[in-house]
């Protein structure tokens, strides 16, 4: 036969467990780091990265070197539609509307892969998100370095010869 529990014993037992769970809940909340990213002045945060627009015109290689002066910095790689919209909002209205913007996309095969299959992010991020402004392999004067096209409000990708000088967006950790 089970011992008979009084109302008083049950109440104290419940209070004890509520107290233990409350204390554990507070401790676990303190251990979780903040997901907010603080970026330097002139830069804006998206997820865990900072982004900055540089309006100084540079070649693709020189632009990436300039971005590397920031912590883990490089030209921007755009991995989702949400990130594309964010970068578009960062750039729109801040550069000459006829100028494209360098991004970290390039074709190391120099156009040898059919259907634009040689394009990749320079850090080897998987190219799952595609947003070409037309087929990059079909243009007569195609380049091997990627850009955001001004005609698409900086949402779609284009290609240029890598020595063309354009403004650019850097993506970096803070």
UniProtKB/Swiss-Prot annotation:
Keywords per UniProt: Acute phase, Antimicrobial, Disulfide bond, Inflammatory response, Lectin, Metal-binding, Secreted, Signal, Zinc
InterPro entries: C-type_lectin-like (IPR001304), C-type_lectin-like/link_sf (IPR016186), C-type_lectin/snaclec_domain (IPR050111), C-type_lectin_CS (IPR018378), CTDL_fold (IPR016187)
Organism phylogeny: Eukaryota, Metazoa, Chordata, Craniata, Vertebrata
Up-regulation conditions: Appears in pancreatic juice after induction of pancreatic inflammation.
Positions of Zn(2+) binding: 106, 120
Protein name (database record): Regenerating islet-derived protein 3-alpha
Domain of life: Eukaryota
Tissue: Low expression found in healthy pancreas.
GO BP terms, alphabetized: acute-phase response; antimicrobial humoral immune response mediated by antimicrobial peptide; negative regulation of keratinocyte differentiation; positive regulation of cell population proliferation; positive regulation of keratinocyte proliferation; positive regulation of wound healing; response to peptide hormone
Segments traversing the membrane: none
């Amino acid at each position: 036969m089970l011992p008979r529990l009084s109302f008083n014993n049950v109440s104290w037992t419940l209070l004890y467990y509520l107290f233990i769970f409350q204390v554990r809940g507070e401790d676990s909340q303190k251990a979780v780091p903040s997901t907010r990213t603080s970026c330097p002045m002139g830069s804006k945060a998206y997820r865990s990265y900072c982004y900055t627009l540089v309006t100084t015109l540079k070649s693709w290689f020189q632009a990436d070197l300039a971005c590397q002066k920031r912590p883990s910095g490089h030209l921007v790689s755009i991995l989702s539609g949400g990130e594309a919209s964010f970068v578009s909002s960062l750039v729109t209205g801040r550069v000459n509307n006829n100028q494209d913007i360098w991004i970290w996309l390039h074709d190391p095969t120099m156009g040898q892969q059919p259907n634009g299959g040689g394009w990749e992010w320079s850090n080897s991020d998987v190219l799952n998100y595609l947003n070409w402004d037309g087929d990059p392999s079909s243009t007569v004067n195609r380049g091997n370095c990627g850009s955001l096209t001004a005609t698409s409000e900086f949402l779609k990708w284009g290609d240029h010869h890598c020595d063309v000088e354009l403004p650019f967006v850097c993506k970096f950790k803070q």
